[in-house]
UniProtKB/Swiss-Prot annotation:
InterPro entries: DnaQ, DnaQ_proteo, Exonuclease_RNaseT/DNA_pol3, RNaseH-like_sf, RNaseH_sf. GO terms for cellular component: cytosol. Binds 2 divalent metal cations. Magnesium or manganese. GO terms for biological process: DNA replication proofreading. It comes from the Bacteria. This is DNA polymerase III subunit epsilon. The active site is at H156.
Amino acid sequence: MSSLREIILDTETTGLDPKGGHRIVEIGAIEMVNKVLTGRHFHFYLNPERDMPFEAYRIHGISGEFLKDKPLFHTIADDFLEFIADSKLVIHNAPFDVKFLNHELSLLKRAEIKLLELEHAIDTLVMARSMFPGSKYSLDALCKRFKVDNSGRQLHGALKDAALLAEVYVELTGGRQSAFKMLDKAAKINNLSYNRLDSQAHRNIPVIKPTKEELQKHKEFLSRVLKQA
């Protein structure tokens, strides 16, 4: 049984539509293998080369002044594409983030770079609407439904929101216990012991059986992200 690598992703932007000149100002992506966070993540604030509208600032609290010395998207594009590799992207309201990411990639004007395909992304907003018709589907609402602690989320933040979405996604797909049962079964089938993920070998990931220590690190990683973001 092979391991399932997924990337939980979120972005913050200067506005609602890249066609209006809006850009990405923050990317947060977290690696999850068999529904367990590995601790590997990709996070950058980005200089959008434009002003920050007040409407956007009210949502995420990221100012134009703060972003002045941050890298441009083209300087981190290759690292971003290497991090997500061919893994499934898990996004809340995927069309929004994919639209902005593809706009940024298209600005690079590099033929070898393939744009992201929306149909290959897992949209947790669509999942929630299907599972709970008539309910509220915001990330905050889903955190409340699944008792995910989002008390530190006064403002939006890409890495912080990706960490919360990771917990919500696990619940949407059967819950933590379901994920652990899958890992135990995989470990028995393959007779493999736990191996730490190597940042240079994420394309060939070993099956992971989570230990008590790893589960504690999983919780500590989420706590650290929510406090720092």
